[in-house]
Amino acid sequence: ISFLALTFFVLAGAIYRFRKRMLHTSLWCLLMLTVGYTTYAVILIRANANTPLNENAPDNIFTLKSYLNREQYESAPLLYGKTYASEPEYVPEGDYYRVKTTKGSAVYRPDKEKGKYKIIRYKEDVCYTQNMLFPRMWNERMAASYKNWTGGSEAAPTQKENLTYFITYQLNYMYWRYFLWNFVGRQNDVQGHGGPEYGNWITGISWLDNVRLGDQKLLPESLRQNKGHNVFYGLPLILGLIGIYWQLVRGKRGKQQFSIVFFLFFMTGLAIVLYLNQTPGQPRERDYAYAGSFYAFAIWIGMGAAGLCDTLRKKKNSVLPISVSMLLCLLIPVQMVL
């Protein structure tokens, strides 16, 4: 706490002392980042209070690292690694064979008598055969579920099936579906697992929704009147796309601004999809994990409204068109609230 307080005051003093624009902005960003990281102090404080529910007991820096890395769960490969059909690699050892492993990171525990941390063991990472580039279908317990999304057999996955799963499930179902919930419309708040009746995105345009999901009027009354049912007719999405276009056509400065917003959009959305490497049958909807990218797209929605007004302002006799465009832009958030 003393270190964080000192860091805060040093950064605040530096911001006051140095008035250069770039340095000033950089220091403010660093200060806000530091303030954000202070929220993790709550985890340490709570763990040291020894509460009845204290998963992983993150009461020191090493157990906190394990807690934040979610090491209680099986780690998913990212760029290269096993598939669900991979087998452990064996090496001879005397008269027997043992599983081949590599030395992993050290596991530390506090030594209260000596007042320091000591290494109690090293983690062992199992080596597998039949590895694959960019492995998306990696969990052996989910072989049947993977095949439900790719339409293949339960044999070793091909790279085509691997990419099919990545696009259809991880990208489309576990990201773009959530994205479209927020900017096009949502069928209901019942968790979906790929079927046509639960948790899909909809537009509110009957013929289009019926082509994708079947006749929505045939759904039970409980689903048609579900409180999570919202239709925006794709208006926020259209306005956001207009905002992207408006930024890109505004020359070098506009492209620079677009790159900043896009970086925020990508790193808080699609990059998380790549990192999590999720398996089918998640216990709950995961839309909350991508909230940052939805905020970023909301910036483009605001840009779209500004772009429409700016375009119409340059035209002669533009009072009426500007008034109409402003009214339409205001109707979009009103529709989202209703």
Predicted regions located by residue number:
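Membrane-interface catalytic loops of GT-C/OST-like multi-pass glycosylation enzymes that act
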Residues: I1, R46-N50, N226-H229, G254-Q257, ...
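Hydrophobic, aromatic-rich transmembrane alpha-helices
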Residues: A5-Y16, Y233-R253, G307
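Membrane-interface junctions at the ends of membrane-embedded or membrane-associated helices
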Residues: A12-R21, R250-K252, A298-P321
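Membrane-interfacial loop-to-transmembrane alpha-helix junctions, especially the N-terminal start
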Residues: M22-C29, G251-F265, S318-S325
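Transmembrane alpha-helical segments
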Residues: T34-L44, G304, P321-L338
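Lumenal/periplasmic acceptor-binding loop at the mouth of the active site in multi-pass
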Residues: A47-I244
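Transmembrane-helix signature of polytopic, lipid-linked glycan biosynthesis machinery
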Residues: Y245-R250, F266-R284, M336-V337
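Hydrophobic/aromatic-rich transmembrane helices and adjacent perimembrane loops
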Residues: Q282-A306
